[in-house]
Swiss-Prot record:
Basic residues bias spans: 46-59
Domain of life where this protein originates: Bacteria
This protein's GO CC annotations: ribonucleoprotein complex; ribosome
PROSITE patterns: RIBOSOMAL_S21
NCBIfam families given in the database record: S21p
Family classification: Belongs to the bacterial ribosomal protein bS21 family.
HAMAP family per record: Ribosomal_bS21
Biased composition (Basic and acidic residues): 60-71
Name assigned to this protein: Small ribosomal subunit protein bS21
Span list, region Disordered: 38-71
Amino acid sequence: MPIIKVRENEPFDVALRRFKRSCEKAGILAEVRRRESYEKPTTERKRARASAIKRHAKKLARENARRTRLY
């Protein structure tokens, strides 16, 4: 749980922004969304595998695009 100490004479919106940023860095909202509903382990693995495949395809596309620009 992120802890924010409000500095003296610090506006509330600035402190709130710092708190939101620290929550984002800690990954709290992503964790809450992930735990909102149960996901079967097979579905979770399938989703993770699909995202890995997509990442790999993106990486290959970037490398191919870079190669074509070199010539």
